[in-house]
Swiss-Prot record:
Signal peptide positions on this chain: none
Alphabetized UniProt keyword annotations: Ribonucleoprotein, Ribosomal protein, RNA-binding, rRNA-binding
Record's subunit section: Part of the 30S ribosomal subunit. Forms a bridge to the 50S subunit in the 70S ribosome, contacting the 23S rRNA.
Function of the protein: One of the primary rRNA binding proteins, it binds directly to 16S rRNA where it helps nucleate assembly of the platform of the 30S subunit by binding and bridging several RNA helices of the 16S rRNA.
UniProt record, GO biological process: translation
PANTHER family membership: RIBOSOMAL PROTEIN S15, BACTERIAL AND ORGANELLAR, SMALL RIBOSOMAL SUBUNIT PROTEIN US15M
Native species: Rhodopseudomonas palustris (strain BisB18)
InterPro entries from the UniProt entry: Ribosomal_uS15, Ribosomal_uS15_bac-type, uS15_NS1_RNA-bd_sf
Matches recorded under HAMAP family: Ribosomal_uS15_B
Positions of the UniProt region annotated as Disordered: 1-24
Membrane-spanning ranges: none
Name this protein carries in UniProt: Small ribosomal subunit protein uS15
GO MF annotation terms: rRNA binding; structural constituent of ribosome
Length: 89
């Protein structure tokens, strides 16, 4: 359900603004989106796993908060993030 270290490094590399950037909202949203996608596929086979579903809702909420922050700071970055990660709003 969690992403591997290699996959996480790849996500960071593709979304980082500069080398060593792991804390920018873009990188955090990308990592959360990857984890959400993994959990979503998990629920296709494990429908009754409600403990993990609660974790999924927490991840979605955290991602939503980060997206709200980006929207408040820069609308263009926000729209680019939504488009890049196929997030519905």
């Amino acid at each position: 359900m969690s992403i591997t270290a290699e996959r996480k490094a790849e996500v960071i590399k593709t979304n980082a603004k500069k080398a060593g950037d792991t804390g920018s909202p873009e990188v955090q949203v990308a990592i959360l989106s990857e984890r959400i996608a993994n959990l979503t596929s998990h629920f296709k086979t494990h429908v009754k796993d409600n403990h993990s579903r609660r974790g999924l809702l927490k991840l979605v909420s955290t991602r939503r908060s980060l997206l709200d922050y980006v929207k408040k700071k820069d609308e263009a970055r926000y729209k680019a993030l939504l488009e890049k990660h196929n997030i519905r709003r």
